[in-house]
Amino acid sequence: MRFSTQMMYQQNMRGITNSQAEWMKYGEQMSTGKRVVNPSDDPIAASQAVVLSQAQAQNSQYTLARTFATQKVSLEESVLSQVTTAIQNAQEKIVYASNGTLSDDDRASLATDIQGLRDQLLNLANTTDGNGRYIFAGYKTETAPFSEEKGKYVGGAESIKQQVDASRSMVIGHTGDKIFDSITSNAVAEPDGSASETNLFAMLDSAIAALKTPVADSEADKETAAAALDKTNRGLKNSLNNVLTVRAELGTQLNELESLDSLGSDRALGQTQQMSDLVDVDWNATISSYIMQQTALQASYKAFTDMQGLSLFQLSK
């Protein structure tokens, strides 16, 4: 009889322990909002959640990379917008300077104006970002890409690239020689077949030198100066077309970054929903199970209490 009593006691204790464990499990799920708190709760879901968490982290990294890329590309576009305006202003000065009726003093004044535009363009070519890094220097960001005197490019040879999505990498920092020392393949050719000037600063230096040279007393000097101005005018047109080509590329990249951001946001929402489906609680089901398990636990307590109240005489009946 004592063996039977012990058996009943152990069974009741197991019932209480099991009910209490289940009740506490549902309580923990309700307090955390998670159905899968420990891997043992659902090994398959827990494993899938780990993989999904890694995908979420990668998506977040690409989002951050696109933010950085957008800032870099936007800054470059803003600077090149100013470069475009400066080149157009220089073109206007060169066209006006080609007027054969100007005096040497007028020409010298125009030379001063064009020198100011050259200085402005050189300053733009050596633009730095908020961290003091030169944006047109490639990976040599700590050194000014263009020399002050001749405007020669001394920056890095490789453009800065950024991985902005799993399968997309783009240039976010052009080297200065691709902008200020380059022309497009369909550039206006020189009438005599000679090589076209590619360096924007050399073009302007040629015009400045021609305008500073007095020509009032020499037809030959006038012709030489006019030829230099004509060549500069052709060069500026080629340089402007090159800058506009780069700006078109930047505009396309900004649009693409915006599209990738939209896709990334959609991907993040989908991943969040997937993660919720895997590990979050079903509140209706969990609350119902919590209440049912609480009721079962109370019943187990009552059964155990009732059993303890029984005498050996009552048990023997």
Curated annotation (Swiss-Prot):
Membrane-spanning segments: none
One record GO biological process: bacterial-type flagellum-dependent cell motility
rRNA processing as UniProt keyword: no
GO cellular component, one term: extracellular region
Cell location: Secreted; Bacterial flagellum
An annotated Gene Ontology molecular function: structural molecule activity
Cleaved signal peptide residues: none
Gene3D superfamilies: f41 fragment of flagellin, N-terminal domain
SUPFAM superfamilies the record matches: Phase 1 flagellin (SSF64518)
Keywords: Bacterial flagellum, Secreted
Family, similarity comment: Belongs to the bacterial flagellin family.
Protein name: Flagellar hook-associated protein 3
Gene designation per UniProt: flgL
